[in-house]
Every structure is written in C-alpha cells, then in structure tokens.
UniProtKB/Swiss-Prot annotation:
Name of the protein: Ribosomal RNA small subunit methyltransferase G
SUPFAM superfamilies, per database record: S-adenosyl-L-methionine-dependent methyltransferases
Gene that specifies this protein: rsmG
Organism per entry: Dehalococcoides mccartyi (strain ATCC BAA-2100 / JCM 16839 / KCTC 5957 / BAV1)
Enzyme class: transferase
Residue numbers binding S-adenosyl-L-methionine: G74, F79, E97, A98, T99, A125, E126, R144
Compartments, as annotated in UniProt: Cytoplasm
Cellular-component GO terms for this entry: cytosol
Family: Belongs to the methyltransferase superfamily. RNA methyltransferase RsmG family.
Length: 235
C-alpha cells in the first residue's frame, strides 16, 4: 500500500496496521470478486490504491468529521464510503446500491473487513429517499456516480438533514454543468457551498469536490419517480 500511504501523507494522515490490513484485504477481495461480476475496470494494484482508495479518502479535504452519519449513493464497489469508514471507524455508514450483485459484494466485503455500523440498502435512490427512515437523516451524502450535477442533486440532497452536506467528486471544467444544476440544487433545498480542487500524488488530473449544503426541507414531490431525474434533469 505504498502509493496510498504516500498519498495520505500529503493529507497529514497515517494508517495503523489494522487499517493497512483492511485496505489490503479490500484490494484482494475486489479483484477476486471482479473476476465473477463487473465491479470496476481498475484492477492493477497501484491504480486501485490511487484511483479508488486515495480518490475516496480525498473527500477529507471537504472537512469530514469522524462521527458523521454518511450515505454513499450508488456505491458500486464501495467507493468512497468504505475507504472513509476504514479511515473513520466511528462513522455510521449507509451504502445505497440498487444492483443486487454489487450489493451482495458490499455485504460480503463489509464482513471480511470487520466493519460494524454499516447498512447495505439495495434500492433505487429515488425510492429510498421517499422512505422516512432515510429521508433527511444524514449529515453527509456522497456519490461518485457518473451523472450530471442536476441529476445528482435530486438523488442526494433529499437524504441530507438541514445543515448536512453533499460531496460530489467531479473532473475537468464543471462551470457549465454547475450552471445547469442551479435550479435542481435550489429546488432540493440546497445551495452550492464551495468547490475544492484535489491535488494529491497521482491525482493531478483536474479533480474537484463539489460541496452542496442543505438549507431547507426538500419538497415532498422530490425526488421524482425512478429514472426520471436522469432522463429529465431539472435544468
């Protein structure tokens, strides 16, 4: 885990032996499971350390606290939620993943990593956000999903409690995308708080963290039915 350790040193973070072992186990299980179902195209040891593990942990640049109640929307293979949980074991973590095979991997890897305080939710975000057990219950919501910011706002902000935040990793020039998302962010009860540049070893490719803050309740009609936020973004 030399690449990860080096990258984390730029953040002033060091891993103990337990955490290093967890990341090693995560890598081995990810590659093994990936041979059976498609979790990721990134499987080389060095690349996983940088493009999955370090990229996930880079969210600490947004000021993550160790006692967050965090929901990872469209978690896939567990990024960024599980690396953040390894780093901050006291986080209460929800991993929202609609694809059953991926959700099964998340359940298995959580056990193998010895993590507690993790809930796997295998449902669509649009449906889950209308459930009072999850709606406006989280201090922090993340999503690495490849989606337009207007769509992401509708799929993430309804989960945020007032005062909570969404952290959405993005790459490249996002000014036009953020302009398009302004209506959706406002309708969901949010505001664009800030955009943080990510400049870490191996991640010098224009990565950014978009931070949204929840400032008012999301109206009951949002999010719309499954599939609609992606097909017809609020722009």
């Amino acid at each position: 885990m030399n690449e990860l350790v080096y990258g984390l040193s730029a953040l002033g973070i060091s891993l103990n032996s337990v955490q290093l072992g967890q990341f090693e186990t995560y890598y081995q299980e990810l590659v093994d499971y990936n041979s059976r179902i498609n979790l990721t195209a990134i499987t080389e040891y060095k690349d996983v350390q940088i493009k999955h593990f370090l990229d996930s942990v880079s969210l600490v640049l947004a000021g993550i606290k160790g006692d967050e109640k965090l929901l990872d929307v469209g978690s896939g293979a567990g990024f960024p939620g599980l690396p953040l949980k390894i780093l901050f074991p006291a986080i209460q973590l929800g991993l929202l993943e609609a694809t059953q095979k991926k959700a099964r991997f998340l359940s298995e890897i959580t056990v193998k990593l010895g993590l507690s305080g993790v809930e796997i939710i295998s449902q669509r975000a649009e449906d889950t956000a209308q459930n009072p057990l999850y709606r406006q219950k989280y201090s922090l919501v993340t999503s690495r999903a490849v989606a337009d910011m207007a769509t992401l706002a509708e799929l993430t902000l309804p989960f945020c409690a007032i005062g909570g935040r969404v952290i959405a990793p993005k790459k490249g020039d996002i000014e036009e995308e953020m302009d398009r998302a302004a209506t959706a962010v406002k309708k969901m009860g949010g505001r664009v708080f800030k955009v943080i540049k990510v400049e870490l070893p191996g991640l010098e490719d224009g990565r950014k963290l978009v931070l949204l803050e929840k400032i008012s309740n999301t109206p009951a009609l949002y999010p719309r039915r499954a599939g609609i936020p992606a097909k017809t973004p609020l722009i």
